[in-house]
Structures are given as C-alpha cells and as structure tokens.
C-alpha cells in the first residue's frame, strides 16, 4: 500500500471515529488556558490542578485541566451532543450541571 493510500485510509478512520464520538457523546475539544502556579486559571477566581474538573452551567460545559505538550497545561472541554431537528417535537433545555443540562427532544407520541 502506498504512503498516500495509507494516509487516506488513516484520515478516513480518524474521521469516522471522531464522528461517532461527536454524535454519541457530545463534543470534546482541547485548547489553551491561562496558567498560574502550574495550574489552570480560567479567570473565575479559582485555580485547578491537572485532572480537576469545573463546570460552566450557562453554556453546559464540563472543563478538565489536563497536561498538554512539553509540560504545558491545557483545558479539555466536553459539551452536549448536537441533535437533528425532530418535527413536531419540542427541544427542552433542562438546566443544571453537565451532562444534566444537555438539551433533548420531548415528542408528544413517544
């Protein structure tokens, strides 16, 4: 198998796996965050050690302070799955803390 073909197959597998994760478990992203004393500093008045979680109830996120590349610190953000529109159903936003705050459809005949 040529290296171009291997790369294409690898990219397809990664896309398929990430699509399954996104549909079944919501979205997971990793990004930069301010660091203070080797801890995550989300500018909310608290510092979080690697492995600690905190929540953004307004946007329904779970955030985890993680070890990044080359000793850096990063944040991993988990959010709700995206739902396709269901005609005749009502999208409910229950509130609370992730994952209980994730929206869901309530359908009259289900």
UniProtKB/Swiss-Prot annotation:
The keyword ATP-binding does not apply. GO terms for cellular component: extracellular region. It holds the Pfam family SVWC. The keyword Secreted applies. SMART domains: SVWC. Residues 1-26 form the signal peptide. Keywords: Disulfide bond, Secreted, Signal, Toxin. It is found in: Secreted. Expressed by the venom gland. One of its GO terms (molecular function) is toxin activity. Contains 4 disulfide bonds. It comes from the Eukaryota. Belongs to the scoloptoxin-16 family. This is U-scoloptoxin(16)-Er6a. The lineage of its organism: Eukaryota, Metazoa, Ecdysozoa, Arthropoda, Myriapoda.
